Every structure is written in structure tokens, then in C-alpha cells.
Amino acid sequence: MDQSIKFDLDLIHRYNQSGPRYTSYPTALELHEGFSDADYRSHITQSNTLGGPLSLYFHIPFCDTVCFYCACNKIITNNRAHAVPYLENLCKEIAMVGDLFDHSRVVNQLHWGGGTPTFLNHQQMTQLMAVTRKHFQLRDDDQGEYSVEVDPRETHSETIRELRELGFNRISLGLQDFDPAVQKAVNRIQSKQQTFAVLEAARNHGFRSTNVDLIYGLPLQTVATFANTLDQVLEYAPDRFSIFNYAHLPSRFKTQRQIHEADLPPAEVRLDILQMFGNKLTEAGYVYIGMDHFAKPNDELAIAQREGKLYRNFQGYSTHSDCDLVGLGITSIGRVGDAYIQNVKELDQYDALISRGQLPVYKGVDLNEDDKIRREVITQLICHFRLDFPSIEQQFSIQFADYFANELVNLGGMQNDGLLDLSDNSIQVHVAGRLLIRNICMVFDKYLTQKQQQFSKVI
């Protein structure tokens, strides 16, 4: 499979609109409060009859400083004692949820996200992993995908060693930009020494994969400053890059109101940055996975994509399509069977529900048959840039051309523009269409029209 990209400025201008990132379909906006504790328990019971491995996501919400660009669910505090009651309740939730799942179901994927997971000290991290191991079947052979997000500003070599000993084998670190003016504008002061020390320690302690997060479109960024940041990181050759377009949505995220809109780079500069990093990463030997993600050709994501086994969920791209995803901690989102479930967002609600022995469910949604069909279509397109109609027809007992008659008509314009090739049996996304894969997927999203302004721009 060709894993390259092509930068076509005219096409990008024409199709640059707001749209979902499709870590799920339906998107999280379709979750509703009518989904209950009992509904979640019922889906777990049904899931156990099918069996299969699990993926666990733990949300550690604490950060000791606020990054103005951040759209994550977080709690800002420099008082480390605030983590103590949260960790106690998280362990109770792990016990409640873990005991509902068949203990023979192996955890093939595990992720600590946030917030800042390294807000916890070593004793707390050890406790969290021990409780998890007690109530879920964790792997002991180091063959699972156990990943953790770290903040280089507060992560030292000893912390990296401790995380590796706890069983983590993949690490992701936020960087965003090295330029001092940009860092000051977003309130994230992070030195090169701190960043590269974490990358070096991760390799020295045997982490199998390192990922670096960068954001373009931040205030005061230029092509030159971002290129300088990227060149320095490339010297350390991380296994993966996640390079996101900053979505400025101050009406939804209060911390973004600290950013001066006049300092944000115009669309033309963003596009120049996009073209620059695409060229640099390709020249450095990385392949384009999709949706702002690049990886080395021998990385598991790149291999899975070439073999047609790549998947996408709330954690991003994954090689574990067969796992039920269990969300733990406030705001976490999971997928069990054909349902999406989100936990409550406020600590007091979380505490109250856990103390009553209830699962801390806030919202959820049961997928109907149409949702399942469209989810599979979007997943295939966003992961493999190709969709074979016969596979969908066989899986769901439909006639693709009849079921998606309107959508196929709407794809005609994209075919004329050179984004894709549409035949009687398939959709093949062209190299020029890969950066615009969200637009192609949006054609199949029946919920989109009234929700479009709540999403970021596709470029």
C-alpha cells in the first residue's frame, strides 16, 4: 500500500470546513443522558458472552499548570494531595467494573491519559497498576500495548524507569513547539533538554515506541519557528508523530480565552506549515497514517495499515480492533459491544456515585443498525483510504448502491476534483485526497448537519 500524501493547495482551500475527527461514529456529541448504569451493565454482560480481549483507558485529570490551548478535560492544581481521594475512588471504580468483566479476558491495550498521568507519584502509580492487575487480566509477557502520556517538564529518568517496571512499553510526550515566544503565548514553558532527556531515557529503559505531539496554528507560530522545532525533534527520530491543527474554540474551552486571536497565524501560514512538515517527515522516511499521524515504516501502525488491520477509536489509531474499550475515571469514554459510554465530568458527581456503589455513567448511546453500517464504512475509509462495497454488503446484508444512493451521488464531485476514484465496487482515495479524508467520511455521517460548527477545521 502506498502511504504517501500529496499537498494540493487548491483542493485544501476548497474543502477546508469544520468536521469530526471520527474517533467514533456516531461521534461523542450523540451520547445522551438517558443511558444508565443498568444499560452499561447489560452491555458488559452481552459482551462477556462473546469474549475477546479488552482495552483499558484511565483518565488522570490533574495538571499543575494550564496550557492555554488545551481542550482536554482537566483539573488545574499544584496541590498533589488532591490526587489522593480521586485515586481512592478510581480504584473503587476499577474494582466495580473489573469484576463485571469475565476475568479471562486479557487486556491487550492499556493507556493512561489526562491531564497529566505523571502528576501521580511513584507510590500512587504502583498502587493504581496493582489494583488494575487484581481486577483485570493484565499481560505479563510485555506483548500488550501499554502506553502512558508524560509531561517532560516534570518527568525524570527515574520516573521513566519506574513506568517501564510497571509494564508500560510505549510513551507519548507533549511538546507543541520549542519557540520561546510561542511557549509564553500558550503558557507552556518547556526546554529542549527536558524533552530530549525523556526521549533518551525511554529508549535507554527499553520502551518499544515513542510518540511526540506537536500542534500547529498556535499563536505567534511561523513556518520558520515550527520547522526549527521539527528539525530538532527529528534528530532524535521518535517512532511516531502526532501533529495536530490547533482548534480555537474559546466559546467551548475557557482557557483558550487567554489566547489573543490576533496572534494566531492566518490560514495561509497554517497551510504552509502543513505542507512543510508533510514534506520534512516524508523526506525523513516517515509514512502518513492519516489524520495528522505519521510513523516509521516499521512501526506497528504502519504495518497494520499496509496489512488492512488498522483501527480507530477514542484513543486514536490502533492495532486492536477486536478489543472492547473500557473507560475509567472522570470524563473517560469507552466502547463495549455496540454502545459508547462516558463517565461523569465533575469530581463531586463521581465521588457520590462511587460511594453508592454505582457505575459513574453520565451519557451513552446504543448504536442502531444504521450506525453500525456507517461506522464500518467510515472506519475503513479513515484507516485504509479504501472501501470495498462487497465486504459491507456481506457483513450487513445490504445492497451498497441502494443503501447509499444519495452518498454516492455526493461523492461524484469529489471524484471530479481528484480526491477519489469511485467504481461500481469500491471507493479508492487518491493520494491528493488523504489529507481531506475527514471530508470524504463526512458524506456518510447522517448526524453532521446540525452539529458541524462544534468541530474543528479539517486542515
Residue ranges and their predicted role:
Residues 52-87, 180:
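Canonical Radical SAM [4Fe-4S] cluster-binding loop centered on the CxxxCxxC motif
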Residues 1-54:
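Flexible, acidic/Gly-rich N-terminal and inter-domain linker regions that tether
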Residues 392, 408-417:
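Basic amphipathic alpha-helical segments that dock to polyanions
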Residues 434-459:
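Short, amphipathic alpha-helical interaction segments positioned at domain boundaries
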Residues 415-425:
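A short, conserved structural fragment
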Residues 426-430:
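Minor-groove-contacting beta-hairpin "wing" of winged helix-turn-helix DNA-binding domains
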Residues 45-46, 76-98, 106-401, 458-459:
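C-terminal scaffold of the Radical SAM
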